Swiss-Prot record:
NCBIfam families: PRK10792.1, PRK14186.1, PRK14189.1. SUPFAM superfamilies: Aminoacid dehydrogenase-like, N-terminal domain, NAD(P)-binding Rossmann-fold domains. Pathway: One-carbon metabolism; tetrahydrofolate interconversion. The gene is folD. This is Bifunctional protein FolD. One of its GO terms (molecular function) is methylenetetrahydrofolate dehydrogenase (NADP+) activity. NADP(+) binds at G165, A166, S167, S190. Its EC number is 1.5.1.5, 3.5.4.9. Keywords: Amino-acid biosynthesis, Histidine biosynthesis, Hydrolase, Methionine biosynthesis, Multifunctional enzyme, NADP, One-carbon metabolism, Oxidoreductase, Purine biosynthesis. It comes from the Bacteria. It comes from Cupriavidus taiwanensis (strain DSM 17343 / BCRC 17206 / CCUG 44338 / CIP 107171 / LMG 19424 / R1) (Ralstonia taiwanensis (strain LMG 19424)).
């Protein structure tokens, strides 16, 4: 029997509805949640992501601001703008869309964001606090993946989980959240010799590499949960993930689609992080 789909769109809609109600209550008290988005350059994919984030804010009662800058913006000017946003009481979350132009040090920029407004969860203070299990914010994509596991009431305690991909944005924080959930976690990276040797034993597989069809049916244990974080395009320009969806769906117990899986949840958890920042600021 084909795997059950974990519908990211449906789950995102439910969580956003609850977030909108919380945002409305805050707004009544004079504390409308506010997200500032900063875009440098003309990267087409970044423009789409930014547009979706701003629209999600508007649709759910959040205040949003969008700063667009040309690709030749200086690092000093960008840092000065972040400093202004750090001091703006109307702004509770600051998101700098990555990637940045090569002449700008993205690490320096992310570290300039006040930790209490770091709704992406990338600041070293939040990344470090994630290790102790008490971050102000969890990175949005791993947070969304955990919510998807929660939605199917998956018993993580004692489960074997394999995260394919070791980025600071997804792979590493994903592994930490799974570990905190009680799973036994393995991280595969670009140097891993035989990824399938690890994934075939896994109860949960999270694919987050950015390589089409990396995870195939013969690499998945029957009944496993497969979460596809990848965002690629096939030969026809159609969106696809890191998982061979058609093949793996015949083996797995649960699977997330691309599109309509992790993507909507990432933006949703950005709203939740911004909302929680606003609630903390409101007291």
């Amino acid at each position: 029997m084909p795997a059950q789909l974990i519908d990211g769109n449906a789950l995102a809609k439910q969580i956003r509805s609850e977030a909108a109600q919380r945002a409305a209550r805050l707004t009544e008290r004079g504390h409308q949640p506010g997200l500032a988005v900063v875009l440098v350059g003309e990267d087409p994919a970044s423009q789409v992501y930014v547009r979706n984030k701003v629209k999600a804010c508007e649709d759910n009662g959040f205040h949003s601001s969008l700063d667009r800058y040309p690709a030749d913006l200086s690092e000093a000017d960008l840092l000065a703008r972040i400093d202004e946003l750090n001091r703006d009481p109307r702004i509770h979350g600051i998101l700098v869309q990555l990637p940045l132009p090569k002449h700008i040090d993205s690490h320096k920029v992310l570290e300039a964001i006040a930790p209490e407004k770091d709704v992406d969860g990338f600041h070293v203070a939040n990344a470090g606090a994630l290790m102790t299990g008490a971050p102000l914010f969890r990175p949005c994509t791993p947070y969304g993946c955990m919510k998807m596991l929660e939605s199917i009431q998956y018993p993580l305690r004692g489960a074997r989980a394999v995260v394919v991909g070791a980025s600071n944005i997804v792979g590493k924080p994903m592994a930490m959240l799974l570990l905190q959930g009680g799973a036994t976690v393995t991280i595969c990276n670009s140097k891993t010799r035989d990824i399938g040797a690890h994934t075939r034993d896994a109860d949960v597989v999270v694919a987050a590499v950015g390589k089409r069809n990396l995870i195939t049916a013969d690499m998945v244990k029957p009944g496993a949960v497969v979460i596809d974080v990848g965002m690629n395009r096939d030969d026809h320009g159609k969106l696809c993930g890191d998982v061979d969806f058609a093949g793996v769906r015949e083996v797995a117990g649960y699977i997330t689609p691309v599109p309509g899986g992790v993507g909507p949840m990432t933006i949703t958890m950005l709203l939740i992080n911004t909302l929680e920042a606003a609630e903390r600021a409101a007291g």
